[in-house]
Curated annotation (Swiss-Prot):
The keyword Protein biosynthesis applies. It is found in: Cytoplasm. The gene is prfA. GO terms for cellular component: cytoplasm. Keywords: Cytoplasm, Methylation, Protein biosynthesis. InterPro entries: PCRF (IPR005139), Pep_chain_release_fac_I (IPR000352), Pep_chain_release_fac_I_sf (IPR045853), Prokaryotic/Mito_RF (IPR050057), RF-1 (IPR004373). Belongs to the prokaryotic/mitochondrial release factor family. It comes from Mycobacterium marinum (strain ATCC BAA-535 / M). NCBIfam families: prfA, PRK00591.1. This is Peptide chain release factor 1.
Amino acid sequence: MAAPVQTIDVLLAEHADLERALADPELHSRPDEARKAGRRFARLAPIVATYRKLVAAREDLETAHELAATDESFAAEAAELEARVAELDSQLTDMLAPRDPHDADDIVLEVKSGEGGEESALFAADLARMYIRYAERHGWTVTVLGETTSDLGGYKDATLAIASKGDTADGVWSRMKFEGGVHRVQRVPVTESQGRVHTSAAGVLVYPEPEEVGEVQIDESDLRIDVYRSSGKGGQGVNTTDSAVRITHLPTGIVVTCQNERSQLQNKIRAMQVLGARLQAIAEEQAMADASADRASQIRTVDRSERIRTYNFPENRITDHRIGYKSHNLDQVLDGDLDALFDALAAADKQARLQQP
């Protein structure tokens, strides 16, 4: 299938304009605009590079056909170039297909304990560590915005902000957007004295954090703002003063906490950013609800019947129930080795999108 030339021309022109703009020192005096331009440039760069490779391969193929007409020894080269052109054309067509507009965004991820009491809180902490280790493998930064710990050091709830360090079309959201849902664990709890396997659950909510959250209007009268002492595990990165901030959005009941910034004002600003991202995500979900039932996969309650994945410790097995994915490397997955699973989820999502009318 030939690539849409008109679309390519538009993108090539935009890429050239951005390249000129980014070379202008004046743009970099406005950091927010420069970062936005840099991100867009990074998204276009692989498309432009693939297009240029395709153009070069087509020119080589045309030359090979001309030479093969008089010298059969060039026939094999022409066949290889035909395959190369087809491959690049397919890649470009895929790149030009509609994408999730948030794929380049960073994320905020919440982990909440559910059924299972203390064991559920310990499992929630395992999930948080799993995501932190995955982020570390990719060179991303993780900030713990808030946490409430259990008696045994688990998480009743924890909120993480995960950000990529560079400008890329495939950001944190593109990899981790499928994690929202109920995660079930089957194992012998540390509180179990008779060695019996128990089942408990923890919930994950993940939403994109766009660079600009300007579409959501937040009325100050809809907010209840509380200041409290940090309840985290301590350490240099956690405040021990009364600077932690909890913001409750009364119309929706959404609660956002932030405790790891250096001052109460900074914690409030960060919490407002997270609240804005959550409200924008909810607004987008509602807008898309009539068009697609896909978005219903995000959890609102922590109920084992809504599980998306099971972590079976006795069998070292992980099962993602949405796509039938199974692997017996649970120990590696909990250490952040999630790429194979995320690749499978992305492939299944892409296939589902292609089948939609």
